[in-house]
Amino acid sequence: MRKLLPVLMAATVASAAAAQTIPNRESARIQNRLAWEHMKVEAWEKAAGMFRQAISLDPTYEYAYYGLGRANMAMKKYVEAIAALEKCGSLYRAEAGRRFANAQEAQRYRRDRIMEIDDQIRQVQSMPQSAKSADQLRQLQNLRRLEQDRIQRGNNMDIDATVPAYVSLSLGSAYFRAGKLGDAEREYKAAIAADAKAGEAHSNLAVVYLETGRLSEAEKAVRAAERAGYKIHPQLKQDIKERAKGGA
């Protein structure tokens, strides 16, 4: 028995350590909700700390990385924002094409996904309303409808995952503010590919085109944003017009 005791103790310690490494999504979601409460009152550093706690509980929690990216953006920590948002996107891409063992596992994943989207919808609704938040809310509601449709069909055991447009949009903005216009352009285009009605992505792409001297593309991007119902800042239109006159 004495010989067995160290073995049993070692096994217990190993089991406890293993348990600590298993992603804990429910606890991470609680930390994430608390982080967004700090975001509402612009307590960016506290929010970032809460997002990091959520990530430590579940390193696969995409939305916590998105929140951390947004918090770092607000603090003008663009390198850190890019890292968090890139990780968020890579987690979404890693899910694409994954196949479930059975239909029950697929349905459980989709129900959990809807629950997380509902969390995100509530968080966006609680933030100050703007064109940006309205567009993100529309995207989230569309994602929810897609997941609900998949649950009702019930026979698809593959994950149809793409990076949400609002993630690519935020990453593009982080790149833009870091002076990386080529990377910003790529991410704005990715946002538009994911959601053609992402008006802010069209508008931001127009700014990139303006900054890089592609005025006809800038005008097209402005028109695309307006078709999507996005209100373009008058100064952007004026800047494009004046630059076009100067080059005539």
What are these regions (language model features)?
Residues R33, G67, A101-N102, S170, ...:
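Canonical tetratricopeptide repeat
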Residues I117-A165, E217-A248:
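Terminal, low-structured helical/coil segments at or just beyond the last alpha-helical repeat
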